UniProtKB/Swiss-Prot annotation:
It catalyses: 7-aminomethyl-7-carbaguanosine(34) in tRNA + S-adenosyl-L-methionine = epoxyqueuosine(34) in tRNA + adenine + L-methionine + 2 H(+). Keywords: Cytoplasm, Queuosine biosynthesis, S-adenosyl-L-methionine, Transferase. GO terms for molecular function: S-adenosylmethionine:tRNA ribosyltransferase-isomerase activity. Pfam families: Queuosine_synth (PF02547). Pathway: tRNA modification; tRNA-queuosine biosynthesis. It is found in: Cytoplasm. This is S-adenosylmethionine:tRNA ribosyltransferase-isomerase. Its main location: cytoplasm. Belongs to the QueA family. It comes from the Bacteria. One of its GO terms (biological process) is tRNA wobble guanine modification.
Length: 353
């Protein structure tokens, strides 16, 4: 299929610039086969049933945006594998070393070997790659990289959120209430609508919950640039499924209960690990690219926000719920003035069979 097959006209005013005042008061579009139902998110309880299994991504967004100086910013992308170690500096003080990939703006102002200081901590440019990507080395004085980012970094809101400045509330609202494993540089946004109260009410109804981890990388915002979508190269992201979670999911599959992925990240994690209809536990990386024709093994329903035209995520929902059906659904959502992208509204999709 061609990239242009996944295009549609999106009015810019529908790109949500701020979260709605209460998480669960965003709109929810139920895309059943019979009709569309537009409701408030807190009513999702009415559309799930006893025995359903909700699978969340528990990755936590880190403050991945750093100002190296007044003219250069970087957005961390991904922690490089097997990179962490502790050593001592010349004075015998403990120093932690950490390696990451990042995107620099403007990258042309950087060269390999450049050093930037944050009090007694240091960032070194170790490699320059294509399209503004760089590799960096953290040399930190007796703190972890996450403690460093909490002190010196900013929440990495997407570029399509165009505000004069960040708001303190973003530190809370661009984070799910259940996130607890640090590593994402963008939010798994379908989960932003959930409150602890809604999760507790779903459990009381008999809906089961489980958690996987996918650390969202900055590559999630990279546009597809090839007209032949099969030529697009996906970014890799770290995933993890515990043996306990795999057992819960496989039991639900065996009992033919519905598995509902909360967000495309949860879906990509589950489908990446699926073999012969079962989920395997473990830590792994995925570059899975889901397009129409993909054979889903694990997920029955998908809760997700509304996505960009010509994006890999719009291709994913077309693969899951139908190409024609998703173009029609998005046309309806635009007519209904629903809010798009990270701080926008949600839709509950059923797998097309």
């Amino acid at each position: 299929m061609k990239l242009s097959d996944f295009d549609f006209d999106l009015p810019l005013e529908l790109i949500a610039q701020n979260p709605i005042s209460k998480r669960d008061e965003s709109n929810l579009l139920i895309a059943s086969t019979q009709q569309y139902v537009k409701t408030k998110f807190y009513n999702i309880i009415d559309y799930l049933k006893e025995g359903d299994l909700l699978v969340f991504n528990n990755s936590k967004v880190i403050k991945a945006k750093l100002s190296l100086d007044k003219n250069i910013t970087i957005n961390l992308n991904q922690r490089l594998k097997d990179n962490r170690r502790a050593t001592n500096d010349d004075a015998g003080r403990l120093k932690s070393i950490d390696y990451w990939s990042a995107f620099a703006k403007p990258a042309r102002k950087l060269k390999v070997g450049d050093e930037f200081y944050f009090d007694n901590h240091k960032i070194i440019i170790t490699e320059k790659l294509e399209m503004g990507e760089i590799k960096i080395k953290f040399e930190l004085a007796n703190i972890s990289v996450f403690e460093f980012l909490d002190k010196y970094g900013e929440m990495p809101l997407p570029l399509y959120i165009k505000r004069p400045e960040r708001q303190k509330s973003d530190d809370e609202r661009y984070q799910t209430v259940y996130s607890n494993i640090q590593g994402s540089v963008a939010a798994p946004t379908a989960g932003l609508h959930f409150t602890n109260d809604i999760i507790n009410k779903l459990k009381a109804k008999g809906v089961q919950v489980a958690f996987v981890t996918l650390h969202v990388g900055a590559g999630t915002f990279m546009p597809v640039k090839t007209e032949n979508i099969n030529e697009h190269k996906m970014h890799t992201e770290y995933c993890s499924i515990t043996p306990e979670t795999a057992a819960i999911i496989n039991k639900a599959k065996k009992e033919k209960r519905r598995i509902i992925a909360v967000g495309t990240t949860s879906l990509r994690t589950l489908e990446s690990s699926g073999i012969n209809g079962n989920v395997n536990s473990g830590d792994f990386e995925t570059d899975i690219f889901i397009t129409p024709g993909f054979k889903f093994q694990i997920v029955d329903m998908l809760l997700t926000n509304f996505h960009f035209p010509k994006s890999t995520l719009f291709m994913l929902v077309c693969a899951f719920a139908g190409f024609k059906e998703m173009h029609e659904l998005y046309k309806y959502a635009i007519e209904e003035q629903m809010r798009f992208f990270s701080y926008g509204d949600a839709t509950l999709l059923y797998k097309k069979v």
